[in-house]
From Swiss-Prot:
Keyword Phosphoprotein attached: yes
Region Disordered: start-end pairs: 180-376
Superkingdom field: Eukaryota
Biased composition (Acidic residues): 180-191
Pfam family, any one: Phospholip_A2_2
Protein name from the UniProt record: Protein PROCA1
Family indicated by similarity: Belongs to the PROCA1 family.
Compositionally biased intervals (Low complexity): 202-211, 284-298
CDD domains linked: PLA2_group_III_like
InterPro entries: PLipase_A2_dom (IPR016090), PLipase_A2_dom_sf (IPR036444)
Biased composition range(s): Basic residues: 243-252, 265-282
Gene Ontology molecular function: phospholipase A2 activity
UniProt gene name: PROCA1
């Protein structure tokens, strides 16, 4: 049942559109077939009635009425607040194809050119309200594919071509009356502009012997006086050139002086930086001199004998080197051990919290004990 109803609707719409196109042909000149509701809403100034039998009853604006009706009966129209061609019209006015809008514009221009009146006509008012004031956009149709059948898992099985409406900006109508108004405004502006003042030449009263610069005023054409500076001397041009050359030379000298000052300042900055670097450079710590080279062997021996351990080492080395030398006696050993005890006692007496500066003790080298002849 659903398929039959859809077929009937399509058939009815096709028959209706065919009847409309056959009845409203562009070559037809009779406008009485237009319904009253259609003619009344086209133009407010056009008097429409159901009893109209001739074209003369429509008045002077029958051509404009015909242009508007052709535009209204166009095939591709998107009604207000209705979706069509995959586009939902939200405007209060309907949207038509861009080709239909261009035809309406051409038709209105033809009616304006055919009319003998120079002033504004009804067609101009209609075009300005439709395109400039309301700014009704137009659309173009682009073919795209739409899915007709789908598989059970969601993929599309077959497609069909669908026309999609793409909206464009409205076409601005350039009315002939606007051009006339612009020309009138330009003429008014030219008239309101003040006349251009002309230069006044030198008066005959001026003496040719005067040299230098002189001001000449003549009969003023406008409110403000015009001043002209001139030099009457034959060498006036050469003098002016000399002055210009002097000024150029002064400027060049000033530039050279500025560059010299900048270079000097840069050199001074570099010198100051070099001095600061020298001051900041760390002082090299002098290495302690090699005592073994500067001191004599006797002084080295004395330094080594300052500690009792080194003394014992020296004595052991001497005994090893000199086999004929006798061993030290017990008294000497006791005497040598006594300074150790003294040092230990001195360390115990010192307080633990205080730091004492190290004191180097230098002991004189004692002569070795003489050999006793009686013992031998």
């Amino acid at each position: 049942m659903w398929v039959r109803t859809t077929l009937r609707i399509e058939r009815w719409t096709k028959e209706k559109t065919e009847d409309d196109t056959s009845s409203w042909d562009e070559s037809s000149t009779d406008i009485n077939r237009l319904p009253s509701w259609g003619r009344g809403h086209l133009l407010a100034s056009v008097e429409s009635s159901t009893d109209a039998s001739t074209l003369s009853s429509e008045g002077e604006f029958k051509n404009t009425d015909r242009c508007c009706w052709k535009h209204k009966c166009a095939g591709h129209i998107v009604r207000p607040f209705s979706p069509d061609c995959v586009h939902h019209d939200v405007h209060l006015h309907s949207l038509s194809h861009c080709d239909c809008d261009s035809r309406l514009k051409d038709c209105s221009e033809k009616t304006n050119s055919s009319s003998g009146d120079v002033g504004p006509t009804c067609s101009r008012d209609v075009d300005s309200t439709c395109f400039d004031i309301i700014q009704s956009p137009c659309f173009e149709l682009i073919p795209e594919e739409e899915c007709v059948e789908r598989f059970w898992y969601g993929w599309c099985k077959s497609y069909r071509p669908v026309s999609v409406a793409v909206i464009h900006h409205p076409i601005h109508h350039e009315c002939g009356a606007d051009d006339l108004n612009q020309e009138e405004e330009e003429e008014e502006e030219e008239e309101s502009k003040p006349p251009i003042p002309t230069q006044v030449g030198p008066t005959p009263t001026d003496s040719p012997t005067d040299t230098g610069m002189s001001m000449i005023t003549g009969a003023p054409d406008s409110a403000a006086p015009i001043t002209i500076w001139r030099s009457e001397s034959p060498t006036g041009k050469s003098q002016g050139n000399r002055v210009i050359k002097k000024i150029k030379k002064k400027k060049e000298k000033d530039k050279e002086e500025e560059t010299d000052e900048k270079e000097k300042a840069k050199v001074k900055k570099k010198v100051k930086k070099g001095k600061l670097m020298k001051k900041k450079s760390p002082v090299k710590s002098e290495s302690p001199p090699d005592l073994s080279r500067s001191l004599s062997p006797r002084e080295l021996a004395r330094m080594s004998e300052s500690s009792p351990d080194s003394r014992q080492d020296l004595e052991s080395e001497d005994s090893y080197n000199d086999p004929g030398r006798e061993e030290p006696s017990s008294e000497d050993i006791v005497e040598s051990s006594s300074p150790r005890k003294r040092e230990k006692n001195g360390v115990q007496v010192k307080k633990p919290g205080l730091k004492t500066s190290p004191v180097k003790k230098i002991n004189k080298r004692r002569s070795p004990p003489a050999s006793n002849p009686n013992l031998s």
